Amino acid sequence: MEQVTLRRALGRSGIEVSAMGLGCWAIGGGVVWEDGTEFGWGKIDDSDSIAAIRRGLDCGVTLFDTADSYGAGHSEQILGKALGKDRDSVVIATKFGWTFADDGSRRSYGSNASPEYVRSACQASLRRLGTDHIDLYQLHIGDLEMAAADAVADVLDELLAKGDIRAYCWSTDDVSRGARWLGRPGFTAIQHNLNVLEDSPEMLALCERENLASINRNPLAMGFLSGKYTKDSRVSPGDFRASGIEWVAVFDENGAPRAEWLAKLDAVREILTSNGRTLVQGALAWIWGRSEKTVPIPGVKTAAQAEENAGAMQHGPLTPEQIAEIDGLLGR
């Protein structure tokens, strides 16, 4: 596939990235919660994961997003291994705040945002990734209290001064929290939920007004916008999308896509697949057309998925007219 790489500024950091990143949650594999419940995206294969990362690189992707808690450290290890000698040509974004047993047991515990923990988590991520710096370090606790977040930012400023990180971000869907660190020069991005079926106008307005990157998790609505799900579909056994968790809006507790989401997708499918795009590529194109600050980070498990996602960069964003038509069809 011809490499065509759209570029985006990573907020006010001076760092430039491809207009889409590669999300590395799924490739970490599952974790085991304290009550014994397994939580993940179903079966994974490390060789497939490495191939997906390498294919993303070949297709022009330069941003790779992970978290220390994904697979209880495994995602970071796989990403570092896959990048290898190409590490200095890419931007690594990882997260901290959710604790786990770093011993191979994949045991996952609660949150911790104490200054001591943030410092130790950063060093552990550097070790797992096999790098001497993290390009974008992200607070992973979306609802952390403001006073605690201020203490976290003080530590992030310290890590920035040491050279352990280059910039930092808060992963949150709360606009007031997204604005909390505006006075800090190292703060350059907000990671938040965004896809064609779930707009986030207030957060996008904040990012545009303050010159922050809008890093978009869930750009394919947890895989729903791949188009492979029908009313008779179910996610695979062991997949958290069948857990009934409140924030899994698209799928019900049996792992089936909800009827109202299928109807919304049918309403906009023709626009998203215009001009030779696949549905996935159209969903990413909507995000780019929504704001010049956006950088979607669709997750992958295979090289084919990475290639299809990156192929969206050959088509570019939807037009303002198409964006407006979608808004009308979805009644917003």
How would you name each of these model-derived features?
Residues 26-29, 70, 98-102, 140-143, ...:
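Feature marks short, surface-exposed loop/turn motifs that line or immediately flank catalytic pockets
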Residues 15-20, 60-63, 87-90, 131-135, ...:
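Short, well-ordered coil/turn segments that N-cap beta-strands
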Residues 89-101:
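A short, structured active-site edge motif that brings together acidic residues
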Residues 34-43, 106-112, 313:
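Short glycine-enriched, charge-decorated loop/helix-capping segments at active-site entrances
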Residues 7, 142-332:
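Beta/alpha (TIM)-barrel catalytic core signal, keyed to glycine-rich beta->alpha loops juxtaposed to Asp/Glu
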Residues 1-90:
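N-terminal binding-site loop/beta-alpha segment at the start of enzyme catalytic domains
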Residues 126-145:
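Active-site groove signature of glycoside hydrolases
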Residues 43-56, 113-129, 173-180:
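Short, acidic/polar
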